[in-house]
């Protein structure tokens, strides 16, 4: 199955991977795909707060490089999860705004409880009811952000990363020492990658490249922890990126955490790095994700990254 056929299958049949039923259908298809191209696959189930099912391809314990993406999909938000990985003040402002939304939900719930109960019950009872309503209101907003109704479109976040991993399995299957993992429950709090580290302590110290939201944007970002960006493999990727990306009409940037803050699974790994695609010129940003407007998955981006990975 070529990259375009994989893309059409993912977007047409397996774009939603949020419920247990949706994940099971996706896992069954992926296992069949891996068998067809001759790559060993195992589903590792664990429970760290939530049930996670990581999909592991190849021998991660003896691999020198592990390529990853998260396959779970997010809840729908009314406002996009706008992100500026290379601009710390704006990044902090974005996180502050999300926190204020949670606080606002609690305040509105508390205010509503007060409006209903004030004068009808003892002031102490009213105060306690307002406090409880406020806590529950904030918890509800947080719940909806993490595990609310599924976002109907997930082309960039993170069907693009899943497509990249599945296509790379075909392209790189003859390259020794490369394994692949699709993590579960990144959107709920990196629980899948936490489970992987618990199960594969030594493998978790290998050079790791994570792909999260690589489908929508004209600038490729490679970033990671210092331990990862210092590795020879990272230097080869940066050199390949600078050479190959212009052939696809793309630009490149790279840098080390915390100058570049990109919150995804790679942050848990001492030699973790990540690719993402960004928009903009003076300020590089990512938008549309976590909303119904997440419909862009540029095949050009995936083909460019596949060519870059051949140099790893």
State each model region's role.
Residues 64-70:
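Short beta-strand element of the alpha/beta-hydrolase
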Residues 1-20, 38, 62-64, 75-77, ...:
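N-terminal hydrophobic or amphipathic helices/low-complexity stretches enriched
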Residues 1, 72-80, 274-277:
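Short, solvent-exposed beta-strand-terminating loops
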Residues 73-76, 188, 215-218, 280-283:
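Short, acidic Gly/Pro/Ser/Thr-rich loop/turn segments
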Residues 15-62, 79-121:
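A non-catalytic alpha/beta surface segment that caps or lines the substrate-entry region
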Residues 217-312:
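Active-site-adjacent substrate-binding region
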Residues 114-233, 261, 265-266:
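Acidic/histidine-rich catalytic neighborhood of metal-dependent amide-processing enzymes
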Residues 1-25, 31, 37, 43, ...:
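N-terminal capping segment at the start of a domain
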């Amino acid at each position: 199955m070529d990259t375009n056929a994989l893309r059409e299958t993912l977007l047409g049949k397996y774009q939603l991977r949020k419920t247990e039923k949706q994940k099971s259908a996706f896992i069954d298809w992926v296992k069949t795909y891996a068998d067809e191209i001759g790559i060993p696959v195992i589903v590792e189930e664990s429970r760290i707060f939530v049930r996670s099912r990581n999909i592991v391809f190849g021998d991660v314990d003896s691999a020198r490089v592990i390529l990853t993406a998260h396959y779970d999909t997010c809840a729908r938000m009314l406002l996009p999860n706008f992100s500026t990985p290379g601009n710390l003040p704006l990044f902090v402002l974005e996180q502050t705004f999300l926190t204020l939304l949670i606080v606002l939900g609690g305040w509105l719930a508390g205010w509503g409880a007060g409006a209903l109960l004030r004068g009808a019950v003892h002031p102490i009872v009213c105060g306690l009811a307002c406090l409880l309503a406020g806590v529950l209101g904030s918890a509800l907003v947080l719940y909806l952000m993490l595990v609310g109704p599924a976002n109907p479109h997930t082309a960039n976040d993170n069907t693009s990363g899943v497509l990249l991993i599945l296509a790379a399995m075909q392209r790189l299957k003859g390259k020794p020492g490369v394994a692949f993992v699709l993590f579960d429950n990144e959107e709920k709090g990196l629980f899948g990658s936490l489970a992987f580290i618990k199960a594969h302590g030594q493998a978790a110290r290998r050079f790791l490249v994570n792909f999260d939201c690589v489908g929508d944007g004209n600038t490729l970002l490679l970033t990671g922890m210092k331990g990862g960006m210092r590795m020879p493999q990272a230097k080869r990727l940066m050199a390949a990126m600078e050479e190959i990306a212009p052939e696809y009409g793309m630009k490149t940037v790279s840098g080390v955490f915390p100058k570049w803050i990109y919150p995804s699974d790679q942050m848990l790994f001492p030699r973790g790095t990540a690719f993402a695609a960004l928009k903009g010129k003076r300020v590089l940003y990512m938008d549309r994700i976590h909303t119904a407007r997440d419909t862009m998955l540029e095949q050009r981006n995936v083909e460019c990254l596949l060519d870059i990975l051949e140099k790893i």
